[in-house]
Amino acid sequence: MSHEILGCADGLLPYITFHRRLYHTLLVSPPGCGKTTLLRDLIRQISEGNEFIKGMSVGVVDERSEIAGCYRGVAQNHLGIRTDVLDGCPKAEGMIMLIRSMRPEVIAVDEIGGSEDVHAIEY
């Protein structure tokens, strides 16, 4: 079961930022190693900002409610003050909807799978 560990991304942020700007980042590891937990904390820190990065607007497509853990439309995990969540939305559709209508500075998704997801990333 996934859970929140605030601060678990502290050591990663210096490696994915430069002059308070964010590099494009892909987290890769075997199942069960904590990618989603790490992603959740990265989203929170990117949204709120800190000494490594300015606060940015983040759009999350949470197809299976694993990142935000939404219940009745309310995120149960803390994803930051500048984060919008599309819960239960297919990733490919959600990424395109975010780009077209919400214009986030960062888009975060968990588990890129099929060619539709890749096409949406290229969009």
Model-predicted segments: where are they?
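Conserved lysine of the Walker
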Residues: 35
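A general structural motif
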Residues: 7-10, 85-93, 112-113
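Hydrophobic positions on the alpha1 helix immediately C-terminal to the Walker A/P-loop
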Residues: 38, 42
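P-loop NTP-binding catalytic core
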Residues: 1-24
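Hydrophobic anchor at the beta1->P-loop junction of P-loop NTPases
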Residues: 27
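Conserved P-loop NTPase nucleotide-binding/switch module
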Residues: 102-123
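P-loop NTPase switch/communication element
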Residues: 47-98
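The conserved Walker
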Residues: 31
